[in-house]
C-alpha cells in the first residue's frame, strides 16, 4: 500500500475510534444523569463508567454542559430526524411540505422521548441549559423558514396571513409542549399526533383551494 494510502487508512481508524469513544462517554453520561441526576454526576464518574480517562472526556466535550449539548443534539436531530428531513426534501408541493412537517416533528420528539424528562429537568435547574434549549428552539424555527416562504411564493397561504405570523404558527404547533401534552400526557399514539398535526397545519396556514387540492391528492 502506498504511503498516502496508509495515512488515509490510519486516519480513518482514528476517526472511528474517536467516534466509538464519544459514544461510550455519551451512553455512560446518559445513564448516570438519568439515575443520579445531573448535578450529582462528575466528569470523573462519567469517565470511569465509560472506561476512559477524565482528560479524554474534557478533550472531547470540554465540560458537563458540552456533554449535555451533545446528548440533546443526538436526541433532537438524530437518525429519525435525518430520515424525515430527507423525505421532506423530495417534496416540491409547498402544501405537501407543510403537511409533512408533522412527520419531522414526530421524528424529533419520538426520538427524544427517552430523554424528555432529563432534558426538561436539566433546563429547569440551570440557566446555561435553558439557554441551550433556546438555541435548539431557534434552530428549529430557522429550519422551518424555507417551507413557509415557499408556501407564500406560490400564493397558497391562508388569506390575510402574514409570513412572520405563519412562521410563528408553524413553530408553535410543532413545539415539544404540544407533543408532550397530547402523547405523553394525553395518551395519543404518535400516529394520531402526526395525522392531527398534519391536518391542523394545513388548515391554519393554507388557503382553502390549495388545501382541497392537497386533500384530494391523498385519495
Where are these regions (language model features)?
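Hydrophobic alpha-helical connector segments
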Residues: 70, 83-110, 167
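Short loop-to-helix capping motifs
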Residues: 63, 112, 125-126, 176
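Short, basic, alpha-helical segments at the C-terminal edge of helix-turn-helix-like DNA-binding modules
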Residues: 43, 72-79
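Amphipathic alpha-helical packing segments from all-alpha helical-bundle domains
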Residues: 103, 107-120, 128-155, 164-168, ...
Amino acid at each position: 500500500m502506498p504511503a498516502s494510502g496508509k495515512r488515509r487508512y490510519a486516519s480513518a481508524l482514528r476517526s472511528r475510534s474517536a467516534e466509538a469513544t464519544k459514544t461510550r462517554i455519551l451512553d455512560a453520561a446518559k445513564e448516570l444523569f438519568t439515575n443520579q441526576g445531573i448535578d450529582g454526576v462528575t466528569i470523573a464518574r462519567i469517565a470511569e463508567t465509560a472506561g476512559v480517562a477524565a482528560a479524554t472526556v474534557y478533550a472531547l466535550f470540554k465540560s458537563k454542559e458540552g456533554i449535555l449539548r451533545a446528548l440533546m443534539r443526538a436526541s433532537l436531530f438524530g437518525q429519525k430526524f435525518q430520515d424525515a428531513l430527507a423525505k421532506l426534501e423530495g417534496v416540491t408541493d409547498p402544501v405537501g411540505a407543510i403537511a409533512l412537517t408533522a412527520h419531522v416533528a414526530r421524528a424529533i420528539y419520538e426520538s427524544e422521548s427517552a430523554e424528555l424528562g432529563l432534558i426538561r429537568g436539566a433546563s429547569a435547574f440551570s440557566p446555561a441549559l435553558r439557554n441551550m434549549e433556546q438555541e435548539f428552539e431557534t434552530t428549529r424555527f430557522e429550519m422551518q423558514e424555507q417551507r413557509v416562504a415557499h408556501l407564500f411564493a406560490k400564493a397558497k397561504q391562508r388569506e390575510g396571513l402574514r409570513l412572520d405570523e405563519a412562521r410563528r404558527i408553524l413553530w408553535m404547533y410543532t413545539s415539544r409542549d404540544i407533543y408532550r401534552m397530547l402523547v405523553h400526557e394525553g395518551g395519543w399514539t404518535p400516529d394520531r399526533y402526526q395525522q392531527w398535526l398534519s391536518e391542523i397545519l394545513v388548515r391554519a396556514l393554507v388557503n382553502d383551494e390549495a388545501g382541497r387540492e392537497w386533500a384530494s391528492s391523498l385519495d
